[in-house]
Amino acid sequence: MTDHDNQRWLQLWRERRTDFHQHGVNLLLSRFWPAFAPATPSRVFVPLCGKSLDMLWLAEQGHDVIGVELSPLAIEAFFRENHLPPSKRRQGRFTLWRHGRIGILCGDYFALSEADLGPVDSVYDRAALTALPPILRSRYVAQLRRIVPDTARVFLLTLEDAEADATLQQALGVDEELAALYTAGFEIALAHVESLFEPDPQNGAPRRVEHKVYQLTGKRPASPEADGRAAETED
């Protein structure tokens, strides 16, 4: 993120303006993850994790969880509030906080390398993408493609404003911005849509929003051999 965005995020945690934090496990995660997850425990990456309780739930399912979070206050609060005494050590440009199956790298997501992150089987994104300014979202997706293997799958939860004039097909379809961001690198499956009226965070007035569950599967890059065979076929 830009230095301005980083400072704003750190300030939110210093001033405890964290209304975005959910005080329980996300119900869509507990409902749809079991069908998405590998049959055996895996390593799950949680970008921009804050102090999300979803990490506890994932660890309770037997997964190893690795998050990344810019604010040390958020990380400290996660371990303190859940009575988990962490160990801390340097890992590249990051500090790794760990207790049991849960580790959180303290630092900038955009500075994360594949070596810093380590092996990943799945990615859990609950509104990390949509929390970013639109100008940064393509960078977020490009960075994800750089640091996770092509075989990793993404469990993506989004909160989208419902368009008043949207057709039913549009409301129940893949968001246009999301399709533009992910189609080049992932196969996109929309698993669930839930339309609700919720208070507008700006003025409290009711607004209709759509909670969507996406399951993304990485596209493997074409090998040089495959490209050569395709060219021979065309000839």
Curated annotation (Swiss-Prot):
Residue ranges of the region described as Disordered: 199-235
Catalytic activity: S-adenosyl-L-methionine + a thiopurine = S-adenosyl-L-homocysteine + a thiopurine S-methylether
Subcellular location: Cytoplasm
CDD domains: AdoMet_MTases (cd02440)
Location (main, coarse): cytoplasm
Biased composition (Basic and acidic residues): 226-235
Record-linked PROSITE patterns: SAM_MT_TPMT
Keywords: Cytoplasm, Methyltransferase, S-adenosyl-L-methionine, Transferase
Record keyword Amino-acid biosynthesis present: no
Classification via Gene3D superfamilies: Vaccinia Virus protein VP39 (3.40.50.150)
Disulfide bridges in this chain: none
Top EC class for this record: transferase
The protein's Enzyme Commission number: 2.1.1.67
Gene Ontology MF, one: thiopurine S-methyltransferase activity
GO CC terms: cytoplasm
Superkingdom of the organism of origin: Bacteria
PANTHER family documented for this protein: THIOPURINE S-METHYLTRANSFERASE
NCBIfam families linked to this entry: PRK13255.1 (NF009732)
Family according to the record: Belongs to the class I-like SAM-binding methyltransferase superfamily. TPMT family.
UniProt name for this protein: Thiopurine S-methyltransferase
Provenance organism: Stutzerimonas stutzeri (strain A1501)
Origin organism lineage: Bacteria, Pseudomonadati, Pseudomonadota, Gammaproteobacteria, Pseudomonadales
Gene name of the encoded protein: tpm
